[in-house]
Amino acid sequence: MFTMKKSMLLLFFLGTISLSLCEEERSADEDDGEEEVKRSLFSIFKTAAKFVGKNLLKQAGKAGLETLACKAKNEC
């Protein structure tokens, strides 16, 4: 009976340790997931800013060229 109690106690102890390790790994994985989401949001924002910036510069460039052509021809 005593050996059975020892083996049950050993199994309980090993199960508790393995459960603790699994919880630590799970929490570490969740932390990494949040960081990946932050990175992806930043990259989306960065891409959108580049797109808007390029389009604004194109529009400003077209308006500037039209103004220069207008002034050169004295049609303004």
Curated annotation (Swiss-Prot):
Keyword list, A-Z: Amphibian defense peptide, Antibiotic, Antimicrobial, Cleavage on pair of basic residues, Cytolysis, Disulfide bond, Fungicide, Hemolysis, Secreted, Signal
Annotated propeptide span(s): 23-37
Range of residues in the leader sequence: 1-22
GO biological process entries: defense response to bacterium; defense response to fungus; killing of cells of another organism
Record InterPro entries: Antimicrobial_frog_2, Frog_antimicrobial_propeptide
Role according to the record: Antimicrobial peptide active against a variety of Gram-positive and some Gram-negative bacterial strains. Has antifungal activity against a slime mold isolate. Has hemolytic activity against human erythrocytes.
UniProt-recorded name of the protein: Esculentin-2CG1
Natural source organism: Amolops chunganensis (Chungan torrent frog)
Lineage: Eukaryota, Metazoa, Chordata, Craniata, Vertebrata
